[in-house]
Amino acid sequence: MNWFTKLLPKISTAKKKGVPEGVWHKCPSCTAVLYRVELERNLEVCPKCYYHIRLDPRKRLAQFLDEGEQEELAEDILPVDRLKFRDSKKYKDRLSAAQKATEEKEALVVYKGNIYGNPIVAAAFNFFFVGGSMGAAVGERFAAGVEAAISERLPFVCFSTSGGARMQEGLFSLFQMAKTSAVLARLAEYKLPYISVLTDPTMGGVSASLAMLGDVIIAEPNALIGFSGPRVIEQTIRQTLPEGFQRSEFLLEHGAIDMVVDRRELKSTIASLITKLTHQPPPDLPVEESV
């Protein structure tokens, strides 16, 4: 500091106050900066580009089920490292990290609740937990949810988002494709509806089993749905895939799914489908949803 700066009066600068964390959210698709409260009110659908932001399972089911009496099922079924598997990291360490990051014990949550007053069993995958992959505990939780629906003669709904089978569990993971398919066959024997909702992304062993076995298969807009990813397919066949390949709209156009439904209309759409499939009176929808 020289003699000149000593003569200058000191200027006090106020500290810039930071914006509290979580107030704003940047859309992953159009990069618009969105007010978090407005986004939640819009069910995590970007109002600018209509991109459907990925949801954790509890937020998903909170949007779908009526407020009030809800019962979580099969939460005591936990993952086990039977193979003592290790790649670049121990499987048990991956599980611990996922449980800490998501505050969940597994990649599937199952609830019994109501939609517009009608009882239902609903399950939702968690893509933030090891990519929503299906291991033995996920398959067992799913089966427990379906068995609960059978025992109480209720419809079953599943929101899928998954990278596929959990490779760290080897054949134990692949067994779940057969297990979930078998228990859904039992549900069908009792003539109880199964609505499968495919969200972004639904891939691998989940798409090749439980996700595609619904009486009605619904997808959210622009969801990636398939077995292998498009890059893997292009490298294998050495051809460029059609535009929009493996996206919801492409699958609807080619007859692989039944409907593409905006998230904000899912609850009313599924409620109407279930009443038709179970020969019940139409649900008493709020005015804004029945218009």
Swiss-Prot record:
Q: Output one GO MF annotation.
A: ATP binding
Disulfide bonding pattern of the chain: none
Cited InterPro entries? AcCoA_carboxyl_beta, Acetyl_CoA_COase_Trfase_b_su, ClpP/crotonase-like_dom_sf, COA_CT_N, Znf-ACC
Q: Could you tell me which residue ranges the CoA carboxyltransferase N-terminal domain spans? A: 23-291
- What NCBIfam families does the record tag this protein with? accD
Q: Name one GO biological process term.
A: malonyl-CoA biosynthetic process
Q: Which residues form the signal peptide?
A: none
- Per its UniProt entry, what is the enzyme's top EC class, as one word? transferase
The UniProt function text for this chain reads: Component of the acetyl coenzyme A carboxylase (ACC) complex. Biotin carboxylase (BC) catalyzes the carboxylation of biotin on its carrier protein (BCCP) and then the CO(2) group is transferred by the transcarboxylase to acetyl-CoA to form malonyl-CoA.
Per the record, the gene is: accD
What keywords does the record list, in alphabetical order? ATP-binding, Cytoplasm, Fatty acid biosynthesis, Fatty acid metabolism, Lipid biosynthesis, Lipid metabolism, Metal-binding, Nucleotide-binding, Transferase, Zinc, Zinc-finger
Pathway it acts in? Lipid metabolism; malonyl-CoA biosynthesis; malonyl-CoA from acetyl-CoA: step 1/1
**Name recorded for this polypeptide:** Acetyl-coenzyme A carboxylase carboxyl transferase subunit beta
What SUPFAM superfamilies does its record include? ClpP/crotonase (SSF52096)
Q: Where in the cell is it found?
A: Cytoplasm
What is the originating organism of this protein? Coxiella burnetii (strain Dugway 5J108-111)
GO terms for CC?
acetate CoA-transferase complex
